[in-house]
Amino acid sequence: MDKLENWNYGSAPSFPYGDETTYRKAIAFLDGPWTIEDWGCGTAWAKRFVERGQYVGVDGSWSLHCDVVADLRTYRSDAGGILIRHILEHNNDWRRILENALESFRQRFVLVIFTPFGDVTRSIGSTKERVPDLSFRKEDLLDFLRPFHFTEESLQTATQYGVEHLLYVT
């Protein structure tokens, strides 16, 4: 089964994945007079927090919440802001997705990771659909961000692993 088929929301109502704190923080940073793409938008919960920008939901599965159906491993765009929240952790091809996002954003980018950092990037669990939960060696992610200006924040949140890491990139 293709990973893109694992989360098919169709006409399901919008709902958040875990604590909405990081949706709010990410959109507060991204919101500006430009397009904000939410890569792996799911049910587009982040959209409700956009006040200034034009929200575009990008996902691998069609739903009423998705504006663009795309495989993030090959997708590139030209967006003022990009949000990737709780996506890289489920993708063994996370490097390709991160590279594409870094090539595509023009103003701001936020990466939100919900798994704890570890000594090595590896799977620490999986969903019932056998999609991995990757824990990252922090340096593996930061190596991609070093050419940019970025700040980071870690929060204890009501999510599966009790933590979320936000990387704010300009």
Name these PLM-found stretches.
Residues 86-90:
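Short catalytic micro-motifs in class I SAM-dependent methyltransferases
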Residues 92-170:
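S-adenosyl-L-methionine-dependent methyltransferase catalytic module, highlighting the catalytic core
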